[in-house]
Amino acid sequence: MKYNLPDRVLRELSYFAQKYSIEKIILFGSRARGTNKERSDIDIAVYGGDFDHFYWDVKEKVHSLLMFDIVQVDVAVSDELKQEIERDGVIIYEKA
């Protein structure tokens, strides 16, 4: 387990990121800070690619009992959220 996420979840996120040409995924929030509780959601920021298809495949097909909060950073995102992502974020996928 890496970043308080099961390896299977990381593999599935990577698979869908490649499938939909996502440039980068950043884990942020309590799981990135290491302050998460067992049932904390998974906050990810997504850059580039086919966001809509990626979003729905992750929501419907990634095998996890945890909820995902998925943010598309390429569109209007508050300055506060951008700062949190930059401060606490951990890159969990980056296109080669």
Model-predicted regions and their roles:
Residues 1-26, 32-38, 47-96:
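Catalytic core of pol beta-like nucleotidyltransferases
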